[in-house]
């Protein structure tokens, strides 16, 4: 059984459900009507071995290439705050550009007690906004959205993300943390003079 959801006009499969994707699996998904596959690269290739021990960066590339071979559009981004350097954030952006990714969720680590990254130093709101702006310069045509952790890390500067390079926002709850109310986010978007559109990935 495949867990999937309809988002806008696209059926989306998330990699937390399917993990590493073979070429045959990718073509099966395409055959049943899936149009987009989600698989974050998480961080820069040079930093990946420092944050993940269950699979390799090449496993990520294997999955993304197979999805693309089958004609699936790939949604891929990562997390800021994994003790990466500013240079590695730029490296990550160029890697997404190289892969031809047009849908980029950018999460912000929320350190949680008892986890391996509990003691990580969080980025300041201005560091995050600078990183967002850099991603926009490197990926000028991509849908780049702020996602998990924005409430905790950006705090009162959340709205500036949408005026500083990003053109999307993920609302509601996330994988491990809750978000703020949908009504509050809609009001923020309205206050910026923007409109809420059909959700896309």
What are the residue ranges of the model-derived segments?
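Single conserved hydrophobic/aromatic residue that forms the stacking wall/gate
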Residues: 1-13
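Auxiliary Fe-S-binding modules of radical SAM enzymes
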Residues: 10, 97-201
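Structural preference for beta-strand elements that scaffold enzyme active sites
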Residues: 15, 36-38, 73-75, 103, ...
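Conserved radical SAM core fold
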Residues: 21-26, 35-57, 73-75, 79-83, ...
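Catalytic cores of alpha/beta
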Residues: 22-29, 83-95, 152-163
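Acidic (Asp/Glu)-rich catalytic clusters
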Residues: 30-33, 65, 69, 97-98
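Alpha-helix N-cap and loop-to-helix initiation/capping positions
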Residues: 52-59, 84-91, 119-127
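Oxyanion-binding "anion nests"
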Residues: 75-81, 89-110
């Amino acid at each position: 059984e495949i867990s999937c959801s309809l988002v806008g006009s696209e059926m989306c499969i998330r990699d937390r459900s399917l993990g590493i994707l073979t070429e045959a699996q990718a073509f099966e998904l395409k055959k049943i009507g899936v149009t987009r596959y989600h698989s974050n690269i998480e961080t820069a290739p040079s930093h990946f071995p420092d944050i993940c021990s269950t699979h390799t960066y090449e496993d990520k590339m294997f999955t993304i290439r197979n999805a693309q071979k089958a004609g699936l559009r790939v949604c891929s981004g990562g997390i800021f705050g994994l003790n990466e350097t500013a240079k590695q954030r730029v490296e990550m952006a160029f890697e997404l550009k190289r892969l031809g990714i047009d849908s980029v969720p950018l999460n912000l680590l929320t350190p949680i007690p008892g986890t391996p990254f509990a003691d990580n130093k969080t980025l300041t709101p201005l560091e995050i906004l600078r990183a967002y702006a850099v991603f926009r310069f490197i990926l000028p045509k991509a849908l780049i959205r702020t996602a998990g952790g924005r409430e905790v890390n950006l705090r009162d500067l959340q709205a500036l993300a949408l005026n500083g390079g990003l053109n999307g926002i993920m609302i509601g709850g996330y994988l491990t943390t809750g978000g703020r109310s949908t009504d509050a986010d809609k009001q923020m978007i309205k206050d910026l003079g923007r409109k809420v559109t059909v959700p896309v990935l």
